[in-house]
A protein has these predicted regions:
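N-terminal glycine-rich phosphate-binding loop and ensuing alpha1 helix
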Residues: 2-55, 97-100
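Short beta-strand-to-loop element that shapes/binds the nucleotide-sugar donor at the catalytic cleft/hinge
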Residues: 54, 112-129
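Active-site regions of enzymes building and remodeling cell-envelope glycoconjugates
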Residues: 57-66, 110
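Glycine-rich, basic loop-to-helix element that forms the pyrophosphate-binding segment
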Residues: 67-75
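Short, glycine-/small-residue-rich phosphate/pyrophosphate-handling segment
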Residues: 121-154
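Conserved alpha/beta core of the MobA/IspD/sugar-nucleotide pyrophosphorylase nucleotidyltransferase superfamily
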Residues: 143-189
Length: 189
C-alpha cells in the first residue's frame, strides 16, 4: 500500500450545501472536519502520502473549471508523477479505512477499481491512456464526462462493497442534519 498516493477530492463548489463541505464538522465527530476525516482514513489505510484536490488548503487546483471530479483527478495526475492513487470524496463521512482496503486488495492485479453503483472512492492505476482520455474528455464540451464512462473506457473493475451503507454522500443541509440525528454509529478508525 505504501506506493499509493491518497487524494481527497475537495474542489467542488458545494452549491447544494451552501457551505464548503470540507470545512463542515464531521456529523458524528465534531472534533474534526469532513476534510480531516477524509485525510485520516487515507492515512490509516496506509497511503504513502495524502494530497488535496482543490484550490484551498495548499491543494492542487483544478485545471478545468466546473468540470466535477474528473477535473480534480486529471489535475492531480498532471501534478504528481505516480502510478497509483486512491481518490476519496470529502463528503463521505461514514467511509473508513477498511472499506478502502477492499479497493486496494482488489486492485492488486494492477487494474483500477471502484465500488459498483457508486462513483467514488476510486483506486486508479495510471498509464498514458488514462491521462490521454481525461485530457481529451475535459477539453471538449460535447464529450461524456461521467465517471462511469471513464471507468468503462479504462476497463476499471467494479466490485461489491461489504458495507454499502457507508458510501453515503452529504450534499445538502438536510443530508447533514439527517446523519447528525441518526443514532450515533461507532466509526472505525
Amino acid at each position: 500500500m505504501s506506493s499509493i498516493i491518497g487524494v481527497v477530492l475537495a474542489g467542488g463548489n458545494s452549491k447544494r450545501m451552501g457551505l464548503d463541505k470540507a470545512e463542515l464538522p464531521h456529523p458524528l465527530n465534531e472534533q474534526q472536519t469532513l476534510l480531516d476525516h477524509a485525510m485520516e482514513i487515507l492515512i490509516n489505510c496506509g497511503c504513502r502520502k495524502v494530497v488535496i484536490s482543490g484550490s484551498k488548503w495548499d491543494g492542487i487546483p483544478d485545471q478545468f473549471d466546473d468540470q466535477g471530479p474528473m477535473a480534480g483527478i486529471y489535475s492531480v495526475l498532471d501534478a504528481i508523477a505516480e502510478s497509483s492513487f486512491l481518490f476519496v470524496p470529502v463528503d463521505m463521512p461514514l467511509l473508513d479505512p477498511f472499506l478502502l482496503q477492499e479497493l486496494v486488495s482488489a486492485s492488486e492485479v494492477g487494474t483500477s477499481v471502484y465500488f459498483e453503483d457508486t462513483r467514488l472512492p476510486l483506486l486508479l492505476r495510471v498509464n498514458d491512456s488514462v491521462k490521454a482520455y481525461l485530457s481529451r474528455v475535459l477539453s471538449f464540451d460535447n464529450e461524456d464526462q461521467s465517471l462511469f464512462s471513464f471507468y468503462h473506457a479504462i476497463n476499471a473493475l467494479p466490485i461489491a462493497c461489504s458495507q454499502p451503507e457507508k458510501l453515503i454522500n452529504i450534499n445538502t443541509p438536510e443530508d447533514f442534519q439527517h446523519l447528525q440525528v441518526q443514532q450515533p454509529l461507532e466509526l472505525e478508525p
